[in-house]
């Protein structure tokens, strides 16, 4: 790592365990024609292991200007590595390839949830994603109804992905050690999307709205007719519904709004 010091404002905790790095790369199942995108290259520990598997190309997205010289020197001999010197949220992944991508990274804790939600909007070009994130966030990704871990993020991402909790990772495997345990998760897009890309943003806002004041009954947030048409108890709360319930409820919500427009036209 040379003289590099991880920066708190970027939420940087560099992964230094070779065993965990290898496990992440194994989960990516890299083939020679793969396009891999890494979010947050840091000093390149994970990047190097990815490049050893010889994918077609690796795009490393990094916002921290102070590590650019380190990355460029470390990977100067790799023709299949491209450093993208930008914030992930300013990068259009669709412009990187005409095919599918594999997405990975040891995500900064301060923006991990935002990145995870954003990942869903690339599901049409995503082959799979493997991330290191805070354990608390990982538990929410695989959260079940009627538990404290079941949140907006659980429902939204489980709608589009099959999510595996791969392993927990202790703080000592990072530099500097974070104050929390981390976890590796793998997200594989579902073969058939229950909500179209065109409606994804509306669905995100819909689920988020239902989880606001999560203890309130659904009848206080959504028309009773929609609930009845979806077969949902008006007295139920968002945390009690399955992912399939949310999908069905959203479908009825769209139909109801469409019918309402027709009636008013």
From Swiss-Prot:
UniProt cross-references to SMART domains, sorted A to Z: rADc
Catalytic activity: adenosine(1518)/adenosine(1519) in 16S rRNA + 4 S-adenosyl-L-methionine = N(6)-dimethyladenosine(1518)/N(6)-dimethyladenosine(1519) in 16S rRNA + 4 S-adenosyl-L-homocysteine + 4 H(+)
GO MF entries: 16S rRNA (adenine(1518)-N(6)/adenine(1519)-N(6))-dimethyltransferase activity; RNA binding
Major place of residence: cytoplasm
UniProt cross-references to Gene3D superfamilies, sorted A to Z: Ribosomal RNA adenine dimethylase-like, domain 2, Vaccinia Virus protein VP39
Keyword terms, alphabetized: Cytoplasm, Methyltransferase, RNA-binding, rRNA processing, S-adenosyl-L-methionine, Transferase
GO cellular component, one term: cytosol
EC number(s) stated in the UniProt entry for this protein: 2.1.1.182
Subcellular location: Cytoplasm
UniProt cross-references to InterPro entries, sorted A to Z: KsgA/Erm, rRNA_Ade_diMease-like_C, rRNA_Ade_Mease_Trfase_CS, rRNA_Ade_methylase_Trfase_N, rRNA_adenine_dimethylase, SAM-dependent_MTases_sf
Residue positions binding S-adenosyl-L-methionine: 13, 15, 40, 62, 87, 106
The keyword Zinc is annotated on this UniProt entry: no
Keyword Aminoacyl-tRNA synthetase: no
Function as written in the Swiss-Prot or TrEMBL entry: Specifically dimethylates two adjacent adenosines (A1518 and A1519) in the loop of a conserved hairpin near the 3'-end of 16S rRNA in the 30S particle. May play a critical role in biogenesis of 30S subunits.
Family: Belongs to the class I-like SAM-binding methyltransferase superfamily. rRNA adenine N(6)-methyltransferase family. RsmA subfamily.
Protein name: Ribosomal RNA small subunit methyltransferase A
Gene: rsmA
